[in-house]
A protein has these predicted regions:
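Active-site bordering "gate/hinge" segments
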Residues: 1-216, 222, 319-324, 328-351
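Active-site proximal loops enriched in glycine and acidic residues that flank catalytic Cys/His/Asp
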Residues: 31, 194-196, 221-223, 230-233, ...
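Short solvent-exposed loop/turn micro-motifs enriched in small/polar/acidic residues
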Residues: 139-140, 210-213, 253, 287, ...
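A broad, low-specificity signal marking well-ordered, structured residues that form hydrophobic/aromatic
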Residues: 145, 190-192, 258-260, 292-294, ...
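Short conserved micro-motifs at the rims of enzyme active sites and ligand-binding pockets
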Residues: 204-205, 231-232, 271-274, 305-307, ...
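Dual-mode signal for accessory low-complexity, basic/Gly-rich regions
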Residues: 212, 228-230, 234-295, 346-349
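Active-site and channel-lining beta-strand-loop segments
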Residues: 215-230, 314
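Internal helix-turn-beta structural module
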Residues: 279-347
Length: 351
C-alpha cells in the first residue's frame, strides 16, 4: 500500500475531524469482507496505521455482508470500544437508531484508500457539516418547494421549520457528510419519474435487492402517499409486486414516502458499471449533487425502497438551490458564505 500524503490527509480527516478520537481512546474498525466488492482492505489498513502511530489501541474485525440481525450480534463488541469505524454496510443499517449503542460510531462511505485520498475523503469534514447546516437553514426558511427533472418529475409541497428538526437525522457520524437532513414528504404531491432501477436504502436486507425498469414509470403521489403508477403495464406490475413483497416481508406501510434529500458533495463519484450492482451504485452515488433520492415503503427513514432522481432541480419559492443536478450555492446567502469561508469547499464547488 502506498501511503501518500493525500491518503494521510484523508485518514486524519476521518479520525480527527470526524471521529474526534484521541490517543487515550480505543478503536475498533469493522471491515466488510473485501471479497463482497464493497470495501477494500487497504482503507482499514491505512486508518489502523495512523491510529497506532499516535498510540490509539486499534483492532480490525472482519465481518460478512449485512443481515437483518447484524446489530444484535455486534452491539456488545462495539460498546467495549470508545470508537467504531465502519468500513462495512452494517454500519449504515441502523443509522437512524440512537438507542442501542453507547459509544461513538462512524459510518464511512469512503470504500478504498484511493477513495479516501481523493477530494471525496480529503474535503475537511467540518466544512461539509457547516455546508449541511447552511442548507438545512435555507430549507427551514423556505415556503413552496418544487422538484423537477429532465424526464418529467414535477413534485411540490410546502415546508416549515418542523420538517428540518435534527431528530429526523441519523444517530451515527457519517463520513464524509453527503446529504442534508431529510425533508418530510407528507405535504408533497405530484409525479416522480422512476427510471433505470429501484434500489434498497441500506436499511434491511432482501432479495432481489434491486429491480430493473425496462421503461420509465410515473409514480403519482398525494400528500406523501403513492396513489398509483402509470406507464408500461409490465413494468408497473413489476414495481407493484416489488412493493407488495417488501411491505409484506417487513410488515410496513407499502406506499408511504417518508422523506427525500439530495446530495451535497461534488467529490462523490462511481466508476464501475451501474448495471453490475445497482445497489452499490445508488448507495455510493447518492451524495452527489447530481442525485436526489426518496425514502419509500415504510413510515420511517430511510424506508426500504429508494427512488433515484438524476439531474434534478429544487426550487425554493421559485429560486433554484439545485439546477439540473448542480448545487447553486451562490443563489443563497447561507451557502454562499459557507463556501467563501472554506477553501476546501471552493476546491470542490469552484475549481
Amino acid at each position: 500500500m502506498i501511503y501518500s500524503e493525500n491518503l494521510k490527509k484523508g485518514v486524519k480527516n476521518l479520525l480527527y475531524n470526524c471521529a474526534n478520537i484521541s490517543k487515550n481512546e480505543t478503536l475498533i474498525i469493522i471491515l466488510e469482507d473485501p471479497a463482497l466488492g464493497w470495501y477494500k482492505k487497504d482503507i482499514a489498513d491505512a486508518v489502523k496505521k495512523e491510529a497506532e502511530e499516535v498510540g490509539i489501541k486499534t483492532t480490525i474485525l472482519e465481518v460478512g455482508g449485512p443481515q437483518n440481525d447484524s446489530k444484535n450480534k455486534l452491539t456488545e463488541t462495539i460498546n467495549d470500544f470508545d470508537c467504531t469505524v465502519f468500513f462495512a454496510r452494517i454500519g449504515d443499517q441502523d443509522r437512524f437508531d440512537t438507542s442501542s449503542f453507547k459509544t461513538k460510531r462512524v459510518m464511512s462511505y469512503a470504500r478504498s484508500a484511493e477513495n479516501l485520498a481523493s477530494k471525496f475523503g480529503c474535503t475537511h469534514h467540518q466544512s461539509l457539516l457547516e455546508f449541511k447546516k447552511a442548507i438545512n437553514t435555507i430549507f427551514a426558511k423556505g415556503g413552496n418547494i418544487q422538484i423537477t427533472c429532465p424526464l418529467g418529475t414535477h413534485f411540490s409541497g410546502e415546508i416549515n421549520k418542523s420538517n428540518i428538526e435534527e431528530n429526523l437525522d441519523v444517530g451515527v457520524l457519517r463520513f464524509p457528510m453527503l446529504v442534508p437532513t431529510p425533508i418530510s414528504a407528507n405535504a408533497f404531491s405530484g409525479k416522480v419519474v422512476l427510471s433505470k432501477y429501484l434500489t434498497p436504502t441500506g436499511s434491511k436486507v432482501y432479495e432481489p435487492a434491486s429491480i430493473a425498469l425496462s421503461e420509465d414509470v410515473l409514480a403519482i403521489v398525494e400528500k406523501g402517499k403513492i396513489s398509483h403508477f402509470e406507464g408500461d403495464k409490465e413494468t408497473v406490475k413489476k414495481i407493484q409486486n416489488h412493493y407488495e413483497n417488501i411491505s409484506k416481508m417487513f410488515e410496513i406501510e407499502k406506499y408511504n414516502i417518508d422523506s427525500w434529500h439530495a446530495g451535497i458533495h461534488p467529490g462523490t463519484y462511481y466508476e464501475d458499471n451501474i448495471n453490475d450492482n445497482p445497489d452499490r451504485w445508488s448507495n455510493t452515488i447518492f451524495g452527489s449533487p447530481k442525485f436526489l433520492h426518496f425514502h419509500t415503503c415504510g413510515d420511517y427513514a430511510p424506508g426500504e425502497i429508494c427512488w433515484m432522481v438524476e439531474n434534478h432541480s429544487i426550487y425554493i419559492d421559485e429560486k433554484p438551490l439545485w439546477k439540473d443536478g448542480v448545487l447553486m450555492f451562490n443563489n443563497f446567502e447561507e451557502t454562499r458564505e459557507c463556501v467563501s469561508k472554506w477553501v476546501d469547499l471552493q476546491e470542490i464547488f469552484i475549481k
